């Protein structure tokens, strides 16, 4: 009999894999399931990107091993996009690396800088991979609560001095998944000062920067003067361009941090398929009005679903960011109990807040990644539960 390693034994079932299992179980029972669980856009990748990939498939250069750090042309496109979008200067040779989706980079990054016993500061509730990556690297995850009364921003002053001194990395993610909370440059400035004081690496996950339904564009932490001294930022084409299945992302920022991640990657993978990078170049140069069309869809969905659920009496954290709604569970339920009732009695898959950590208890998350008519159908089914 074979036994899992200790590092695997301490991991809970991966949240989204468990949701998928429950969904498939209901589908096999003949239930018309509405999946509002995983943040996987239902819209197609814009056609110019697909056409670029088709053309790139014919290029024999893309049939060979790719560069470990990514094609220069893709890294240059990333640097140019950061300059246009955030007015941040990046050297494509030393401050940009191509990822096989940002999840891969996030999971691998701690391996470059965390020694056994080092502390990794992980927000809670949060994307589970921050904590998982720390565990795989032999680090000790330390929970930094994100509370609604603080607009789901970490309270840096509450981190004990001895913990801060032992910390190697602090993870942040704004616009935030799962809460949809926005970032502020004021918070980023305070965080950069704090990180410099304690010599802590800031690892920023900015995957949702282009998914906003208001007029205020989310910033990058790299806009803060001096942030590049301590920060690396992970980004992805998945959410912005409906490319979750393409697995293409990037990490940018401090050149030593980028180089460390690169050293891990050269030893564990062989880079991203060249044709996908060629398509990524087209994505990064897509006219802004094309991305705005995608945002318009989420604007409509968020408005309609927020109104429908608030009429039922559900309390929603109002935000102009991400394609999620972060909602308080009705009184008398835990997160798991309520989400369990939704799938069992209404055929709706949602994500329990406690799946993102203990401070997510009392909430659930829905993804606005199905057509409007399905969202309204979901709202009607919830209404019929007579909560």
Swiss-Prot record:
Keyword terms of this UniProt record: Aminotransferase, Pyridoxal phosphate, Transferase
Superkingdom of this protein's organism: Bacteria
One of the GO BP terms on file: lysine biosynthetic process via diaminopimelate, diaminopimelate-aminotransferase pathway
GO MF entry, a single one: L,L-diaminopimelate aminotransferase activity
Location of N6-(pyridoxal phosphate)lysine modifications: 239
Cited Gene3D superfamilies: Aspartate Aminotransferase, domain 1, Type I PLP-dependent aspartate aminotransferase-like (Major domain)
Family: Belongs to the class-I pyridoxal-phosphate-dependent aminotransferase family. LL-diaminopimelate aminotransferase subfamily.
Subunit structure, interactors included: Homodimer.
Record-given protein name: LL-diaminopimelate aminotransferase
This protein's encoding gene: dapL
């Amino acid at each position: 009999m074979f036994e899992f390693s200790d590092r695997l034994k301490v991991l809970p079932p991966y949240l989204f894999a468990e949701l998928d299992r429950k969904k498939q179980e209901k589908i096999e029972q003949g239930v018309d399931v509405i999946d509002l669980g995983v943040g996987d856009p239902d819209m197609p990748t814009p056609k110019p990107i697909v056409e670029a990939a088709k053309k790139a498939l014919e290029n024999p250069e893309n049939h060979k091993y790719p560069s470990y750090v990514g094609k220069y042309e893709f890294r240059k496109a990333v640097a140019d996009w950061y300059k246009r979008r955030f007015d941040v200067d990046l050297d494509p040779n030393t401050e940009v690396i191509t990822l096989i989706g940002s999840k891969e980079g996030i999971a691998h990054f701690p391996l470059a800088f965390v020694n056994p016993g080092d502390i990794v500061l992980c927000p809670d509730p949060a994307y589970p991979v921050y904590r998982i990556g720390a565990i795989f690297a032999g680090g000790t995850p330390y929970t930094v609560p994100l509370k609604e009364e603080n607009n789901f921003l970490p309270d840096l002053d509450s981190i004990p001095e001895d913990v801060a001194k032992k910390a190697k990395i602090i993870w942040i993610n704004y616009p935030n998944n799962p809460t949809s909370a926005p970032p502020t440059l004021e918070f980023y400035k305070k965080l950069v000062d704090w990180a410099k004081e304690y010599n802590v690496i800031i690892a920023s996950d900015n995957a949702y920067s282009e998914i906003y339904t208001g007029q205020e564009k989310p910033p990058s932490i790299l806009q803060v003067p001096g942030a590049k001294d301590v920060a690396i930022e992970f980004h992805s084409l998945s959410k912005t361009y409906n490319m979750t299945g393409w697995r293409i992302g990037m990490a940018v920022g401090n050149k030593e941090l980028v180089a460390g991640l690169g050293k891990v990657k050269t030893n564990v993978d062989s880079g991203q398929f060249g044709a996908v990078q060629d398509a990524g170049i087209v994505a990064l140069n897509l006219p802004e009005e094309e991305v705005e069309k995608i945002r318009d869809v989420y604007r409509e969905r968020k408005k309609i679903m927020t109104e429908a659920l608030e009429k039922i009496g559900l309390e929603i954290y109002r935000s102009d960011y991400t394609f999620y709604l972060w909602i308080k569970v009705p009184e008398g339920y835990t997160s798991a109990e309520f989400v369990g009732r939704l799938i069992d009695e209404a055929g709706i898959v949602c994500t329990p807040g406690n799946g993102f950590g203990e401070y997510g208890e009392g909430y659930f998350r829905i993804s606005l990644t199905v057509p409007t008519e399905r969202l309204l159908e979901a709202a009607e089914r919830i209404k019929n539960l007579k909560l």
